[in-house]
Regions:
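Predominantly five- to eight-bladed beta-propeller fold
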Residues: 1-8, 15-69, 73-75
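Beta-strand C-termini and the immediately following turn/loop, strongest in propeller blades
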Residues: 5-9, 17-23, 53-57, 92-93, ...
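Non-catalytic accessory segments flanking enzyme active sites
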Residues: 15-21, 26-29, 56-62, 73-76, ...
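Short loop/turn segments that connect beta-strands within beta-propeller blades
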Residues: 67-71, 126-128, 177-181, 223-227
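Active-site proximal loops enriched in glycine and acidic residues that flank catalytic Cys/His/Asp
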Residues: 78-80, 112-114, 126, 136-139, ...
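Leucine-enriched alpha-helical scaffold segments used for protein-protein interaction
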Residues: 172-173, 185, 228
Length: 253
């Protein structure tokens, strides 16, 4: 799934979320080796690896949170029917304090994919209570679900999310509320959003790249307040932008 590790520190660095695999019920596969770098070995070596062949039990994945101060581990309450893959875990930004919640916490977001890889579910979990609730779901009856688009999602400080999906036939960006309700399509048109650079939350501007044709990719800025779009690049070819942290400057490569 394009990852070499599955752990993530919370924005305040007080907790670490990680995926744990339990291979207790996975049968062991054994084999022998007779050669090493020096040639034939006098005594062969036996190796063992837990490997689930077709029809055998797979390793079960669980999402856990380690509290660095209290040195405790909590297991998030993922629904039992979700026994597939967990290729991504991320933390949401820390919300602004309110009168009702003076010390708000980040949520833990869990991406789950079924074994057929044609259905993806996104859960938002409370690391304190370990309760997870459904936030987003997408399923295809013909193709696999492009879970890699999850890496393009933008989690805003006010709880909203810019979701990138192919559900409408084209790869487009949508705005979702903090409850996981679709609010509107941000990038209408018969073309694909190939990259989301990010959101200037202060100015409420979304920066992204669009494949107008297979040979041309331009960069755009969408003012989400005024619902106006500005093309930032000119000329043919592929334009890839690299922005400064304050979103005031960029390099066009």
């Amino acid at each position: 799934f394009g990852v070499t590790c599955l752990f993530a520190f919370s924005p305040d660095s007080k907790q670490v979320a990680f995926v744990r695999l339990d291979e207790t019920n996975v049968p062991s596969f054994e084999w022998q080796t007779f050669l090493n770098d020096e040639g034939m070995m006098m005594y062969p070596q036996t190796h063992s690896l837990r490997y689930p062949k077709a029809g055998e039990a797979n390793a079960t994945a669980s999402v856990c949170v380690y509290d660095i101060y209290y040195k405790t581990i909590k297991t998030m309450q993922i629904p039992e029917h979700m026994n597939g893959y967990v290729p991504r875990i991320v933390w949401t930004p820390i919300p602004a304090p309110t009168k009702a919640d003076a010390q708000p916490m980040s949520d833990l977001v869990v991406l789950h994919i079924n074994r057929d890889q044609n259905k993806m579910d996104v859960l938002k979990g409370n690391p304190k209570s370990t309760v997870c609730r459904p936030f987003y779901s997408e399923q295809s009856n013909k193709y696999f679900v492009n879970y890699e688009l999850f890496d393009q999602w933008q989690w805003l400080a006010d709880g909203r999310v810019v979701v990138v999906s192919e559900k409408g036939g084209y790869q487009q960006a949508y705005m979702y509320s903090v409850q996981g309700v679709e609010q509107r399509l941000l990038t209408p048109g018969e073309c694909d959003v190939t990259q989301v650079y990010g959101v200037d939350e202060k100015a409420q501007v979304l920066y992204y790249q669009v494949a107008n044709t297979p040979m041309i990719r331009q960069a755009y800025a969408l003012n989400m307040k005024k619902n106006t779009t500005t093309c930032l690049t000119q000329g043919e070819g592929t334009h890839t932008l690299y922005f400064s942290k304050d979103w005031k400057r960029y390099v066009d490569c």
